Structures are given as C-alpha cells and as structure tokens.
Amino acid sequence: MKDYVRIKIASPQQVLSWTERSLPDGRLIGRLTNFDMLHFETKKPVFGGLLCERIFGSTKTNQCFCGKYKKMFQKGYANNFVLVCANCFVEINNCNRRRFRMGYIDLVFPLIHTWYLKSRPCYLAIMLGKKVKNIKKMCFMDSYIKIRNNDGQTVGILTGAEAIYSRLSKIDLESLIEFLYKRLVGIEKLKEYNFEKYLWLRKKFINRIKLVNAFIQTNTKPIWIMIHFLPVLPPDIRPVVKLQDGTVIMTDLNFLYIDIIYGNNKIIKLRKFLLPEEFMLNEKRSLQVKVDAFINNENISENPYEQNDKKLKSITEGLKGKKGRFRENLLGKTVDYSGRSVIVVEPKLLLHECGMPLDIALELFHPILIKMLIRFKFSVGIREAKRHIYNASNFVIPVLEKVLNSYFILLNRAPTLHRLGIQSFQPKVTFEKAILLHPLVCSAFNADFDGDQMGIHIPLSLKSLAEARSMLISINNCVLPANGLPSILPSQDMVLGCYYVTLENCNLDFILTNLKIYANIEKVKSAYHKGEILIQTFVWLICQKFPNILKNSKIRIKKKRMVKKLVFFRTTIGRIFFDDMIKEFL
C-alpha cells in the first residue's frame, strides 16, 4: 500500500478515463457540446449541456428525466444494478453522483496551458530550448514556423498552439538528454577565456536536463502539457440556483465554461464551410484567451469576461490562497480530538513543554478522564464522572495533570510548509485561554505573538504516541531538514532582552560616588530583591578566589602596616543573573 501522494501531468487518455463512461448499449457519454444550461420553458437541464443528466446523473434520486421510472424504486426494487431509461438514456441512481461525475470539452486543436507558459521559470521555453519572449510571440500568433517537405520546400505555416504542439511532438526525450550531456561537456572549453558565458550556458543546460529527467522518470510525454480535453467539474461544485422571483444565479465557472464551448463550436462550424486557416486565426486566438481566463483570470490585462466591473473567479483563484480549496477545506478541516487557540509567549517553560488551556484539556481528554476517575474511585459511573468534569471539581485537575505528565500533544501552525510545522510537546495545564509556547521554537513554526493561532491534536494509537514521543518532539527537531541550519534561534526580543540585562549604567554618579560593595554574590541578589539596587547598577564584588580566576598571572600583595589589599570586580546584577543562566544551561 502506497502511503504518499504524487502529482504529475495527466495524459489525454487519463482525462478521458475520468470524464467518459459507456452505457449498457455501448454508447459513450461525457462530451459537452451545448453551451445552454437550462431549457427556457421547462427550466430542466439541456442534454449535452453543462447540467446534462445523461453525463452527470439525474437531479432527483431514483428518477429519470422523462419520469418513466419515477415510482419504480419506491415499491422496494433492489438498486444493485445499472438501469438506464430507454427513452431519455438517463441512469436511474442516487443524485449524489452529480457531486463527483465529470464531463469534458473536446477542443478543436490542442491549447497551451497557461501555467507552463506564464509561470517562472517558463517550463515550455526550457523544454523547447527557446527564449521566453519568442515562445510568447508564437503562442499569441505574432510569429510562425514553416512546414517543409522532404525536398525542403515550404508547404505551409503554423502559429499559435498548433506550432507549439508540432515542436513538442517531435521531441525524443532519450535523444535530447544525450545531446544535452554532450553539449554540457563541450562548453568546458569556454571556461578559460569566457567564464561568464560558460556559467550562463551551464545553468541553461542543467535546468533543461533536470526538466527532461523529470519527464523521463515519470513516463510523461512533452505533448501532455497541452490541453486536448478540458475537464468539466461536477455540477454540484458549480451550482445553479433558482430564486423565488424566477432569477437564476450561477457561479463564475459556468460563465467561463459557456464561453469556451461557444468558441469551440464556432470554430467547428467555420471549418465546415472549408474556410482557409488564415480567416480563423482570430477565433483560435479568442479560444486560447477563453481557456486562459478559465485557468487563471488574473494575468489577462484586457479581460472581456467581466461582470459588474469585476473579473470572474477562475479555477486557480478557487484553489490558491488562504480561502482556497486546499488550505480552507482540505488542510484546514476540523477533525476530532483537536482544538485551536491563540499562542502567547512563556519563557519559563522548557523547550519540550507547552501550556494547554484548562477548558481545551478537559474537553480533549474527556474519555481518558472518565476512565481515570472511575479507576481511582472518584466516580461510580460515566454519568457521575461527566458531572465532576463539567463542574471542574477539586480532584479533577490533579487527575488531569497526572494524565498530561505521561502524554504528548501535537501543535500545528498553518500553513504547514515543511515537517517542522507540526511538533509534539508535553502539555502543562494553564488557567488562561491561550496556548503557552516557548519563544525558541517559534522560528521553526514561523510564528510570532501578534495573534497567531495554532491547532492542538491528540494522538490516540500507541504507534502515533510513540512517534510523537520520539520523532516529533521539539528537542529532536533542532535543525532544518532542507539545509541543516539550526531551527532553534533566538528572536529579536530575546536578543534585546539579553542586551538589556547585561547593559551597564555608565553614569559617573554610579561609577565614582555611589559605590556598592558586597562580599559575595548572595548578598548582591538579596539587595536586588529588596529593591536597594537596580538591574543595571554597578556593584563592586570582592573576589575571594582570585588565584583560580587569574591562574596564569602573578599578583603581588604588598604589606604595609599589616593592611591586606583586596581585589574587586565591577559588574552588574543583570550580568550575574545572565552568568547563572548560562552556567545552568551548560
């Protein structure tokens, strides 16, 4: 069983396997040919349209389009076989199938995917070995390529997506990578007399080799980056709603699909009139713009698909960002045994500890607490234990602390861009509403204390508990997996705090007149706690063990009238505290 997800380019046959299916009589359905959605009189879905019941399934459970099988399944017939109406060819089944069944638009010619053209780096230009501006000129039909026969004579020209498709179809990946390796070895001669050009060519060839290797390893053909069949999302994901006043509203994706189907059908009709290809260049360019607007509507400067001075929401906008499908619905979904709260700093915690609010702890560890209360004879049954937990009795918190002492929880901060975005900590009960976090682990989470929130997850199985205790614990994740640099770094406020603690008050009044002399460190700390000195006040401390400190130097003590000369050190109480913390850490 594979425990990973791999994303790669889908072939046209793979897209057809997603979107096309066959009826019991052998008829293939799935292709959308009609840009109409609802019949203007009956308000029912049009066959071959964006809401077609033949392609996506019936709109009502166990009922076909014409109503022939309306009462059949209400009488208790078994629904363990595929039944298709002989009149309307609609499958009689559950209407929930309209949530996952897809259709497709058979494009007249392969179109360019805007992600591979307008992204950085431009993978289309890298694969073809051309400049980005030249590729864009050809895509927007500002340049062309000539088609020659075996005799070298020009028999036609190609431009736009058809020219790109012609170039990609002629690429042999095995021969291309062998050629690139030879060129990479051949440019070594440039290193001696033109080093800058050598570096530029070397980077260019290495990037192209990496891309070609990725295509070879995933068994992907270069022509697959062109769009042959455009998938159409299920109708329930792009709903059409009818209001009480008869107004029909629908999502922006439906408008974009309508434009694509209309432009595609228009080119098909023009070809039936046997018009020269030169007369259809404008329609081809228009169809390319419509598909680009469907995929990503932001990069189109002059957008003809605007409603109320607002661009239509493309499929890319529905996927990316904080409110996109991934972060909002897939990665950020609510799961059982989890909580969420704001994080605040608590430097008194250990590196592997975190503060957990009492309300969250009582709710997440509710079943375990019930079991422990019954085991320790605090409660007779489950109902009594729940009442004690709800009232937060005096003996509940000690039992909860005993449970948390041997338990580890997972803290996650979205977005989880690398594996350090989720780590395990030993929880400590706090009577606040926020999660307490050690400031040193914030750099791994990319978190700060300006309102960031973190999620709490409880591992349940023994395997997950062992993994949280050994692998995910914060003290075992001190380096970044990408480059090996330390992930536990002091933040700016910690550096400023160390600077403030070790700062000296250079006022001459403190240095020369108000001399504070103490016999040992304990008396200095006692004076600070009594409020006699400040944290940056100079103090003079008698050095009683100076031979151990100045081991390699000779100190001469002169006796004059039996008076012993002492050695003093000038320091501050802040430096004494800082030195104690360093010694305790070491």
Curated annotation (Swiss-Prot):
PANTHER family, A to Z:
DNA-DIRECTED RNA POLYMERASE (PTHR19376), DNA-DIRECTED RNA POLYMERASE SUBUNIT BETA (PTHR19376:SF54)
Top-level EC class, please? transferase
Substrates-to-products reaction catalysed: RNA(n) + a ribonucleoside 5'-triphosphate = RNA(n+1) + diphosphate
Coiled-coil residue spans: none
E.C. number, please? 2.7.7.6
Binding-site positions, Zn(2+):
64, 66, 85, 88
Q: Which UniProt keywords apply?
A: Chloroplast, DNA-directed RNA polymerase, Magnesium, Metal-binding, Nucleotidyltransferase, Plastid, Transcription, Transferase, Zinc
Its main subcellular localisation, reduced to a broad class, is plastid
Q: What cofactor is this protein dependent on?
A: Mg(2+); Zn(2+)
SMART domains per UniProt: RPOLA_N
Q: Spell out the family assignment given in the record's similarity comment.
A: Belongs to the RNA polymerase beta' chain family. RpoC1 subfamily.
- This chain belongs to which protein, by name? DNA-directed RNA polymerase subunit beta'
Q: Which domain of life is it from?
A: Eukaryota
Q: Which GO terms describe its biological process?
A: DNA-templated transcription
Source taxonomy: Eukaryota, Discoba, Euglenozoa, Euglenida, Spirocuta
Gene Ontology MF term list: DNA binding; DNA-directed RNA polymerase activity; metal ion binding
Q: Which InterPro entries does the record cross-reference, listed alphabetically?
A: DNA-dir_RpoC_beta_prime (IPR045867), RNA_pol_asu (IPR000722), RNA_pol_N (IPR006592), RNA_pol_Rpb1_1 (IPR007080), RNA_pol_Rpb1_3 (IPR007066), RNA_pol_Rpb1_3_sf (IPR042102), RNA_pol_Rpb1_clamp_domain (IPR044893)
What span is annotated as the signal peptide, if there is one? none
According to the record's subunit comment, the protein's assembly and interactions are: In plastids the minimal PEP RNA polymerase catalytic core is composed of four subunits: alpha, beta, beta', and beta''. When a (nuclear-encoded) sigma factor is associated with the core the holoenzyme is formed, which can initiate transcription.
